[in-house]
Amino acid sequence: MGNSPSYNPPAGISPSDWLNLLQSAQRLNPRPSPSDFTDLKNYIHWFHKTQKKPWTFTSGGPTSCPPGRFGRVPLVLATLNEVLSNEGGAPGASAPEEQPPPYDPPAILPIISEGNRNRHRAWALRELQDIKKEIENKAPGSQVWIQTLRLAILQADPTPADLEQLCQYIASPVDQTAHMTSLTAAIAAAEAATPSRVLTPKTGTLTQQSAQPNAGDLRSQYQNLWLQAGKISLLVLQLQPWSTIVQGPAESSVEFVNRLQISLADNLPDGVLRNPLLTPLVMQMLTESVSKFCRGEASGRGGAKTAGLRTIGPPRMKQPALLVHTPGPKMPGPRQPAPKRPPPGPCYRCLKEGHWARDCPTKATGPPPGPCPICKDPSHWKRDCPTLKSKN
């Protein structure tokens, strides 16, 4: 994450205030170095130790930092106050400095443009992992959650493609769909309100123009819209009735999908498409066995996945394996032998019909059917041939 220190705040400052100070430090010119962040941390320790109270917007102004002791920290504080005063988010001068906790929630520092300086760099996988690790323990949509993403965006100046990659990495499919819906609506409203001298329709949409190397204010505007859409979509999903609809243990997938469709049709606001949101919701709220089956059909389209759920019955309950043979009821009397299959032709021993050769009555006694194959004598069997016995 560049030269930024840990997002965890030191003692004596709230997480929101610390993230705002880090964002303000990123606006220094020339860019901040590790020593600037060390000075900022030492200033917070000094303030908390000398003032005996946490650092806040009202008590920690530029004049609270002794000149020449903490490097460029006064510039960081001045930039923070200037940005918040322009946005109207800082507390008024009449606010008491000794305000007991809980403190009023501070304003979120917006993303501002730094001219045409090319600061963009694509996020590496390690950086995406760091961002996800920083926000996974924070409440989605909270100020600290938003500010952490703001700081990451301010450091890398991401393009729309980079932000889409980040959304896919940190959000679930349901959150991604809801975020894209909110972002599309926000971009349409911004394009209608932006003057033509700033956003030229002939050059492309806001998304296309903000991807250019020297987009400047347009890219900052897109980044703010992306964050705003993320916060709105998370709040909408958390408060909607369909967020609690899950498939019952004995409920068929068809009934579950129908219940979800009815809830979406009744509760989605006007202008929000239902179909893009239906498939990820179904995949997330299905039972584990059915969800695994659907993930196995990953090669199909989203509509085919949802339609394929109609072929899946209710989840199967685990049962003991059936025996290979189940004995039937005992019949009175001796057990009857199985009927024998009739022979296909006459016996090859006695040339008579009606029995198999193995059951031939002449097998043990009687003349052989033909001459001995060894000595050609027709009066004895091969086993009784004297020639065979003399050889043995």
UniProtKB/Swiss-Prot annotation:
Residues 329-346 have a biased composition (Pro residues). Sequence repeats lie at residues 342-362, 367-387. Residues 327-346, 361-392 are annotated as: Disordered. GO terms for biological process: viral budding via host ESCRT complex; viral translational frameshifting. SMART domains: ZnF_C2HC (SM00343). Gene3D superfamilies: 1.10.1200.30, Human Immunodeficiency Virus Type 1 Capsid Protein (1.10.375.10), Zinc finger, CCHC-type (4.10.60.10). A zinc finger (CCHC-type) spans 345-362, 370-387. Residues 377-386 have a biased composition (Basic and acidic residues). Keywords: Capsid protein, Host-virus interaction, Lipoprotein, Metal-binding, Myristate, Phosphoprotein, Repeat, Viral budding, Viral budding via the host ESCRT complexes, Viral matrix protein, Viral nucleoprotein, Viral release from host cell, Virion, Zinc, Zinc-finger. The record marks 109-110, 323-324 as: Cleavage. A motif (PPXY motif) lies at residues 100-103. GO terms for molecular function: nucleic acid binding; structural constituent of virion; zinc ion binding. A lipid is attached at residue 2 (N-myristoyl glycine). This is Gag polyprotein.
